Amino acid sequence: MNDTEFHQLVDAQMQLIEESIDDSGADIDYEVTGNVMTLEFEDRSQIIINRQEPMHEIWLASKSGGFHFKLVDNKWTCSKTGMELIAMVKEECEKHAGETIDWA
């Protein structure tokens, strides 16, 4: 994968995260600045998701720690847990929000 393909794939994941948050109706604010997406919760806690172009990875930082995701079989997969990125984002959002979120 070249850098252009990497950015296109990450853009698609970021869009999926935004749409999932919007569709859920959860009280989560998000902002994208450059290569960084910040999710902010009612208690002001944050989840930071950023693209690491040199390694072709997506990194996620939350209350639970830091996680690195690589594209494996067309899925962004965590090197620590084996979870897919979108599943971990949803799980971490629920931890930060302190409640179950209806992801529809």
UniProtKB/Swiss-Prot annotation:
Give the record's keywords alphabetically. Iron, Metal-binding
Residues annotated as transmembrane: none
Q: What the protein does? A: Involved in iron-sulfur (Fe-S) cluster assembly. May act as a regulator of Fe-S biogenesis.
Q: Does the keyword Ribosomal protein apply?
A: no
Could you say which protein family the record assigns here? Belongs to the frataxin family.
- State a GO cellular component annotated for this protein: cytosol
Q: Name one GO molecular function term.
A: ferrous iron binding
Q: What is this protein called?
A: Iron-sulfur cluster assembly protein CyaY
Q: Which InterPro entries match?
A: CyaY, Frataxin/CyaY, Frataxin/CyaY_sf, Frataxin_CS
Fetch the PROSITE patterns from UniProt: FRATAXIN_1, FRATAXIN_2
Entry's Gene Ontology BP terms: iron-sulfur cluster assembly
